[in-house]
Regions:
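Catalytic cores of nucleotide-sugar-dependent glycosyltransferases that transfer UDP/GDP/TDP-activated
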Residues: 2-192
Length: 192
């Protein structure tokens, strides 16, 4: 039986990404696949779902990630232990396809995850629900009328917007780190 693993910080169907993910899981099941959904347990607890649930992390991990974001503008780069634990679960599941919706949301370390995905050589589908994956900080650059992301982010006009950083602006470094991590998977295995 083929296996699908989807990743998103929220599971609840009151959010667009949670609903989309659950509906894709139901469609996969209806077509004979085994469906798994990985999400931030600390943010959503246990919710009804037809797919097998893979809760990731806990409240302490989310709090540490929140602090790394708010103080150092390093969103997506904390939760190291939770990410390594999740990778062990991915190995156990051994999915045929990994479908990423969002990986921001205080629950995964994208560098660790993408280093693993690049080595696994499995197809990765990434549905782009917002702009965070290709900017140095923000989710929606249009709110600030900013087009720095086209060349290189830095001095982010939305530093204090979600995911807010109150001390540092590391949008230049974040842009570099994301580009390196997100392009580490062979193009033939990455579908965006």
């Amino acid at each position: 039986m083929k296996k699908l693993l989807q990743i998103n910080p929220v599971l609840r169907v009151s959010t667009s990404t949670g609903r989309i993910m659950q509906e894709i899981g139901e469609l996969a099941i209806a077509n004979g696949w085994k469906s798994y959904i990985a999400y931030s347990y600390a943010r959503d607890g246990i919710k009804p779902c037809k797919s097998e649930l893979v809760p990731v992390g806990g409240k302490i991990g989310v709090l540490g990630h929140w602090l790394a974001t708010r103080l150092f503008d390093r969103h997506g780069l904390a939760s190291e232990r939770d990410t390594k634990d999740f990778i062990r679960v991915i190995d156990e599941i051994d999915p045929d396809i990994i479908h990423i919706h969002n990986i921001h949301g205080y629950f995964l370390n994208y560098k660790i995850l993408f280093d693993y995905l690049a080595r696994r050589n499995k197809p990765v589908v990434w549905t782009v629900h917002d702009c965070w994956l290709y900017t140095g900080h923000c989710y929606y650059y249009t709110f600030a009328g900013c087009s720095k992301w086209k060349i290189h982010c830095g001095r982010c006009p939305q530093k204090k917007k979600f995911p807010a950083s109150y001390l540092f602006d590391r949008s230049f470094k974040n842009f570099e780190d994301k580009r390196k991590a997100f392009t580490s998977i062979q193009a033939s295995n990455m579908f965006v």
